[in-house]
């Protein structure tokens, strides 16, 4: 399962580009998988908490504490960085996407 391909439609290209930079800089920290919810902290100028909850049909419920998400209710670079991290966890066998 390619998480990135499945959910990229939720993010504007410019947001994906910026999130990819955050991911490759190693700013995704403190990742916690609890049942069907995955949370992390993403370090930039400030640290923000990003999270995704997957429903049984794999529909995601997203949240982030950054101003962009809070003010515009729009998916942000922190969330895309988290999706890239989740994709890596699945690819490396650290997470069974079908089980969440």
Language-model-derived ranges and their functions:
Residues 1-100:
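Long, low-complexity, compositionally biased intrinsically disordered regions
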């Amino acid at each position: 399962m390619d998480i990135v391909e499945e959910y990229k439609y939720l993010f504007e290209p410019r947001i994906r580009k910026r999130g990819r930079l955050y991911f490759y800089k190693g700013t995704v920290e403190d990742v916690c998988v609890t049942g069907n919810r995955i949370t992390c902290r993403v370090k930039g100028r400030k640290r923000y908490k990003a999270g995704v909850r997957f429903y049984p049909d794999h529909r995601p419920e997203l949240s982030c504490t950054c101003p962009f998400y809070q003010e515009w209710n729009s998916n942000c670079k922190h969330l895309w960085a988290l999706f890239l991290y989740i994709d890596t966890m699945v690819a490396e066998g650290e997470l069974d996407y079908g089980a969440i």
